[in-house]
Amino acid sequence: MVNWTKEQEEAIYTSGSDILVAAAAGSGKTAVLVERIIQKLLAEHNPTNIDALLVVTFTNAAAQEMRNRVGAALEQALAANPSSIHLKKQLSLLQRASISTLHSFCLDIVKKNAYILDIDPSFRIADDMEMDLLKQEVLDDLLEEWYGDSNPNQDSFFEVVNRFTSDRSDAEMEELIRSLHTFAMQSPWPNQWLDKLVQTYNIPEEWTEEELPWMNVLRDEVSRQLDAVSQEIDIAYSITQEADGPYHYAKTIEEEKAIIQEALKNMESWKYLQQSMLQVKFGKLSGKKVDCDEEKKTKVKKLRDSYKKRFQKMQEVWFARNLDAHVYDMRVLAPVIKHLVELVKQFQDSFAKVKKEKAVVDFSDLEHYCLQILIDESSTEEEVIPSTVAMQLQRQFTEVLVDEYQDTNMVQETILQLISDRQGSGNMFMVGDVKQSIYRFRHAEPSLFIDKYKRFSNSDDPSIRIDLARNFRSRENVLLGANYIFRQLFDEDLGEISYDDAAELIYGNKMYDDHPLEAKPELLLIDNNSEDVEQSDNEETVEDLEKAQIEARAYAKQIKNWIGTPEDEIPMQVVDKATGKQRDLQYKDIVILMRSMTWASTIADELQQQGIPTYADLSTGYFEAIEIKVMLSFLKVIDNPRQDIPLASILRSPIIGLEEDQLASIRLADRKASFYEAVQRYLQNEQDNSDTVKSLIRFMEMLNDFRQSARQGSLSELIWDIYRETGYYDFVGAIPGGKQRQANLRALYDRARGYESTSFRGLYRFLRFIERMEERGKDLGAARALSEQEDVVRIMTIHKSKGLEFPIVILGGMNKEFNQRDLSEKYLLHKDLGFASKYIDPVKRIQYPTLYYHAVRQAKFRDMLSEEIRVLYVALTRAKEKLLMVGTVPSIEKKLEKWQRIVDHPSWVLPAYFRMESKTYLDWVGPALLRHVGSEKIRTENIGNQVLESINQDPSDWQITMNHALDYMDMKDSSMDNDDNLKEKVFNWESVETEQEGLKNDVDARLSYEYAYKQATVFRAKQSVTELKRQQEVKDDYSDQQILPPSHGPIGKRPNFLQKKLKLSPAEKGTALHTVMQHLPMTHVLSEPEIEENIEKMVLEEKLTRMEADSINIRAVERFFHTEIASKIISGNDMHREVPFSIMLPASEVYANWKDQSNEKVLIQGVIDCLLQADTGWIILDYKTDFIEDNPTSQKEQELIHRYQTQMTLYRRAIEQIWKQPVEQTYLYFFSQQLLIEVPYRD
């Protein structure tokens, strides 16, 4: 019985209104959601039917897990109350219940209402590959049309091209249209969103600032910057007022503060604000010599330089040109933007038309089609009216439950609102955590959650907010550490939510109390400053190492300490979730989280060199893998052999294996022609039988065969033929990394099959698709060659780790800068502010950002930083027992100096300007921890009394460690060192002595070792009943003793492709007849037509092939139903068919020649055709398809009994030993003669 907390119970049982459950990390939100569903189904009064609930999950896996949990609860309830009709009904409805992703729900709605949309109801969902190909095809056709002379708007089109693309290719134009299309489709009203882009630039002649909504973003940002300037001025001024402060600076600073205050008064008007900002001139500080503290004097100067620089930057960037000039620039761009939008709409129409013709959709189409069905035709963007279908769904669903609500986008929100009850007080139950909303790149809209989060806590709103803050994942020290960090980072400015008492993580898993662990959350700082470092004997220097290598070695050192060694160190103990007890730490308990995977390959290599098994699921590197390069080159040559580089690479590859001098000789055969023609000329000229000629002849024959296959067969078959005929697949499996290399080759085959399952065909188009992916910088990622349970340290992105948990988390690359590349493009896109382009003059060849561009950039920048704080929250909350953050910095001293400027900030949350100017996670976490009482050792000055008392009293217990990169110089793989020493001695002709005197004797002993149980090596440890029966038949030493006698024919069932070409063997016919007897109904005497009908059904169900079905003697089967044994079966006795068993028997009983005195046992396996319940036990029936002569004599029957005596005896022993019930009789039934023989028991 689960002990739910008060808040969890409230979330499970509260009803009657819209409910938002703000569930912190590790708070058991999925369990609560499932329990709510179960309790609604099991309620004593007015229980809900499961088909009256719509449950929306984020992934298919989550939906299936939820369905399984609900099913298990229903089965348990039904076991306790087997007569409940309601529970039986719920179980029958479960598989059809609406528990799915929103995309699956949309698919169901669209399929059922396809007639409304006038689309083919048999449409299929295309994958990303096919959609990419379709988009490219449509763009190619449209660009050809737009560039054509018949285009009436050619001049307008060229205007767009000249402003937004280079003269090298149309790639930028294509990407621009793709981006605008993708962004538009994230709106419930895509065409209206595009129209608004044009409206933004169509500024009237007489305009006011109120008509420029994007100006509010800039005003807010200027206000924040001026507040930051004021704060720095206040700090500087307060220092001048101290007893030994630089008081002679006070007057200048005070005057500058007054100017800033004046500027803040003009925030309502940009014109007046600009005037006041540009009037500010910073004078020089007094040069008067006074007796004051030099440190304080320097600090005031640095503070003044900081706010002066901040202010001057605003003057230069935002106020250098007046607003009228910026508006004029936008008016100039207006017609260009208008035509660009027309191009995007034309692309959308053409793309939609092509998808309709091919009857394919993507996930975005599903959402928009669903929306079209649910929205009444009279709806507008301002007033959304539900359609008849939507109102039917509102009546059907008594509650709509949404998991991971923080990741919902506007289209999905509109769909959910249309099918939920808007007439009453609401019936939506939403679960999520906005602090974990990290999918803005997928257009997730955290503001939807935040709006409800604020509104539902208002007493005037009937809706309810429930906070689940109790964390059941992590140890208390991990939670306290996370709380300490995020109280200083989250607020409504950045992170978009305050980290108040309701948002804090509360320790909930008391299981850890029984297993204390000294493992503080830790920040490891690595100083990579190579200056003033003494030279060491080590040849490797700090400069030689990348940051990734340094950090990887730091990880390795920590991991080795945690794992321990068999000789001297005890492994760290972690609590096993399944048992609740402590166990040794394993590699798979450790994860290394990175913001991106750019370092992953280097880190994995370094860890593996240190003997630490590691796996990184890379999203890049697939096309760079040598085996993929070779295969793509081969495919290119098959497509067109007159491609010199691919052809040369294939000839040089292990597939053909020519050396450089051989390739040179071929080139000399014809220097001017293509390399393929040079190969042909070489073969014509060279009449000898050299290795080169043999290799080239073999290659040309192979190439001709493959080119023929490419014209006639499928692409995937061609690829597999290459693997098989060249042996390349086996070859790469035998070289280092073979498992991964083969996985990559299989992935190429799978991707080719996926390509062919689309509406596209052909080798050329497949290769062109791959080339375009490479041109756009896309990669497929190496194929996965690792199971989830393998004991390795995993490297993954923070995004991949969401929803997972690990005993130990290493968060690496803390000092890697945030990715801001998107903020410097020619154009920026924002869901609310639209499309902001730099002003581009193609004639003067100049471009510069407009004020509108600055506004959109600032909004995107703030959104990006808010997301980064949430990503950091996800990372820190993955840890169950130990959290280690690692950052490598060029100079710790300079970092500490920067961080210490704000440690005395008078509130918990770090200043907004400081957080916004931070470029790395370390620049957030570092100053936060520098305020911690545990950081006294690393502070460069005594600032303890300047920190807030509540911060000093915080219960978190952090460990801050500082190392130098030099500490990781001596961590080269020891085996490599030994190899290097050995090579050096051999090179210098020095004697090589072994370190162990007894090494020779040890080697001799191992080479002459004899296994103590020789006899066990020549007898099988596992036997089938059929094989034992064969050994009894053939009384010779060969069959009786050899463990693996040579095979004289195919073992087991032949593959389907062979079955289609050959006749069935007698054994295969027998197997087919056994399949028929296994699946035929035994409820009455079957006639021949009934038997034939059932066999056809088995073919349709793919239980039999057509050839197997045709081999069945239907007359023989029909005769079986007229036997005495069949009558017993039909009479209703308990009967089991195809009963598998395994039993252990002493080897001496199984093998007549067994002479060993050991207690060896043999595993016997078999399958009993039919078991029939008798009065006091069981009857065994075994079907035989042996051909026997007509009217067999009693002597012949005795021979048959003798042949199968061993088999039937083993069957009897198995049933009696396993089922603990006696076997009364054992029978053989021979179909060829309708003969039933009883086999007596032989002890």
From Swiss-Prot:
It comes from Oceanobacillus iheyensis (strain DSM 14371 / CIP 107618 / JCM 11309 / KCTC 3954 / HTE831). The keyword Ribonucleoprotein does not apply. GO terms for molecular function: 3'-5' DNA helicase activity; 3'-5' exonuclease activity; ATP binding; ATP hydrolysis activity; double-stranded DNA binding. This is ATP-dependent helicase/nuclease subunit A. Its EC number is 3.1.-.-, 5.6.2.4. Its cofactor is Mg(2+). One of its GO terms (cellular component) is DNA helicase complex. The gene is addA. It comes from the Bacteria. One of its GO terms (biological process) is double-strand break repair via homologous recombination. ATP binds at A23, A24, A25, G26, S27, G28, K29, T30. It holds the Pfam family UvrD_C.
